[in-house]
Amino acid sequence: MDIRTLSKKLKLSITTVSRALSGYSDVSAKTRTRVEKFAKKYKYSPNPYASRLASGKSNTVGFVLPLYGLNSNNLNQTSFFEFISGMTNTIHSENIQFFMMFANTAEEEKKAYEKLIYVQKVDKIILHNLKKKDSRIKMLKKNNVKFVTWGRTESLKNYSWVDLDNEGSINLIMKYLIEKNHNQIAYINIVENYNFAFQRQQGYLKSLKNFKIKYNKNYYLSVKNEEPEESAALIKNMLKNNPKITAIICSTEYSGVGAIKACNELNKKIGKDISVITFDGPVVQLLTTPALTAISHPRKELGSKAIEILLDMDKKNYTPKSYLAKPKIVERGTVNTLKKI
């Protein structure tokens, strides 16, 4: 059945039926309920293109996945697809469209966003890999495109976001390690121009201060986002020069794999001679023996929440919303308890 036939049965205009099925408030609740019951009875599913014409909106969510920089290795790409899985589950249940583009360079990424706005005419976008200052936010606001960010900039003014509690996660890890009598704790981060990396760095520094542990610059490592081999070489060198280190915190899953490689090359038994804890990824725990103890990162949940917030933006008097996922530690086999001295 098409919308024309359905509207005739209901004795309503096509526009009214379309807007009722889209949940617009200018159609009374009584009429919306009646239309929905008829649509269900006759198994009618709205044509998305017809809905666009009736509403004047594309009702499409755009997403750009860069395949360079932070996502240049397969581990991080897998993490993004878990977030996307959470997005698409909610998207499909709400009968809206999803358009994803890929970019191999920064220039391609810029053009991809321009294409989403000017060619595909999406009216909603999800941003990710937020920098401390991110020009994409200004661009989307200028073009009146609704958006939610996965992550935060250093300023939280006038936009909606979902994120993991990065500082809180590091504080939780530090507390966990200190309760197991570790105080020689190294931290492996990535370059801090990504705001989540900066937040985690701040969490590490604040935790050291709170737990009255003196900061040792030799215990902090900031690595570029490349393959795990690069971080492995740097971590190996750090451990050789600082033999008192008893635990390593890894800010990303690929550096966690690098830490394991470094420890193995130095014949350090993980979970006995040295402890390693990382931010969890959907595959990283399958790549290591013993399995990595990690901070759980609910990417699917964040993806779903991002879409829910985007949909709320169509309501009147919308104000920016945020969702901060609380961290939890998943204990596996890579952290040991030291004897108390």
Regions inferred by a protein language model and the residue ranges of each:
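N-terminal helix-turn-helix DNA-binding module of bacterial transcription factors
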Residues: 1-59, 340
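Hinge/beta->alpha junction and helix N-cap segments in small-molecule ligand-binding domains
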Residues: 70-80, 100-108, 162-172, 188-234, ...
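Short acidic/polar active-site loop segments enriched in Thr and Asp
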Residues: 13, 59, 123, 183-184, ...
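Amphipathic helical "hinge" segments at domain boundaries
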Residues: 45-111
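Flexible loop/hinge segments that line or gate small-molecule binding clefts
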Residues: 128-168, 254, 280-292
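Flexible loop/turn connectors
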Residues: 232-341
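Short, well-structured alpha-helical segments in soluble
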Residues: 109-121, 231-244
